[in-house]
Amino acid sequence: MTVTVRVSAKVNLALGVGGLAPDGFHPLATVFEAICIYDEVAVTRRDDSRITLTVSGEDADQVPTDETNLAWRAVELVREEFASEWGKRGHGADIHIDKSIPVAGGMAGGSADAAGALMAAAALCRLPYSPEELQPLAAQLGSDVPFCLTGGVALGRGRGDRLAPVICRGRHRWVFATSNQGLSTPAVYRRFDELGGTPGGETVPNDLISALTRGDLDAVAASLSNDLQAAAIDLRPELEEVLTVGREVGALTALVSGSGPTCAFLVRDTAGAKKVSAAVSNLPQVHRTRTARGPAAGAQLLPGPVGSFA
């Protein structure tokens, strides 16, 4: 039996990063928005104990298909934590991911796939699988995984995994320009530290939250920020040109998405999206452009029969 879950990408509307803490992590204050770019994650029971993972879709060859993939780890986590529900015979699972979310692009593609695999595995063995009920397990997999379950718009604190919903009136139109080359999140944080960091920088972006609540698009655009942007551009200077071109042709604002290298452009309407997309598509450092709206829902179980590992 197979369970399939649809998961959405994210963009950080604001990302405030504090200095490196003794535990090796940076405290964060971030506002997430889920975006209508989706992966689908299918988990199928096996009669033996093996776990396999296959990938299709955009840039599938760049996605690991072993235990280093967060989706694989999500299924293993459910199997370890709920051995009796999973099945007395120690069943395995086949995981398949159909990719549309950019790979290594700062849009939480790997975390979204982990959220999808977590929900699918829980549903297969008849465990509670609502986003709220899966939060403790999600936090064990990665900082972005809890938000990828819930979607919408949320304020994240701590490592980004302590979430509070944010009221968002209105919809946002985005253009995303992906890069020809990925950018390692740990490398970006290391460069952030080398550039001096921002001790105490994990502040709540009150102006942005107020603008979202009012549905004031221009105020939202004026309030977007990313403390990792300077580090990402220092590692990949060509990103600055992408941001500049998007602004020059009418984007309300432009910023690096999360740790990059994807560049995000907030636009007013469909015409603006087309103009920005056409302009940045001509740059040699841009792999492809995508238009999308937000906010989007979180992880969603797609219709179909649900089996059991019993």
UniProtKB/Swiss-Prot annotation:
Question: What reaction(s) does this enzyme catalyze?
Answer: 4-CDP-2-C-methyl-D-erythritol + ATP = 4-CDP-2-C-methyl-D-erythritol 2-phosphate + ADP + H(+)
What's the Enzyme Commission number for this chain?
A: 2.7.1.148
A Gene Ontology annotation in the biological process aspect, one of them, is:
terpenoid biosynthetic process
Q: Where is this region: Disordered?
A: 289-310
Q: Where does ATP bind?
A: 102-112
Q: What InterPro entries does the annotation carry?
A: GHMP_kinase_C_dom (IPR013750), GHMP_kinase_C_sf (IPR036554), GHMP_kinase_N_dom (IPR006204), IspE (IPR004424), Ribosomal_Su5_D2-typ_SF (IPR020568), Ribsml_uS5_D2-typ_fold_subgr (IPR014721)
Q: What is annotated as the active site?
A: 10, 144
Which top EC class applies here?
Answer: transferase
Q: So, what pathway does this thing act in? A: Isoprenoid biosynthesis; isopentenyl diphosphate biosynthesis via DXP pathway; isopentenyl diphosphate from 1-deoxy-D-xylulose 5-phosphate: step 3/6
Q: Which UniProt keywords apply?
A: ATP-binding, Isoprene biosynthesis, Kinase, Nucleotide-binding, Transferase
Alphabetized Pfam families for the sequence = GHMP_kinases_C, GHMP_kinases_N
Q: Please give one Gene Ontology molecular function term for this protein.
A: ATP binding
Q: Which cysteines are joined by disulfide bonds?
A: none
Q: What is its biological role?
A: Catalyzes the phosphorylation of the position 2 hydroxy group of 4-diphosphocytidyl-2C-methyl-D-erythritol.
Instruction: Give the NCBIfam families listed for this entry.
Output: ispE (TIGR00154), PRK03188.1 (NF002870)
Q: Which family does it belong to?
A: Belongs to the GHMP kinase family. IspE subfamily.
Annotated protein name in UniProt: 4-diphosphocytidyl-2-C-methyl-D-erythritol kinase
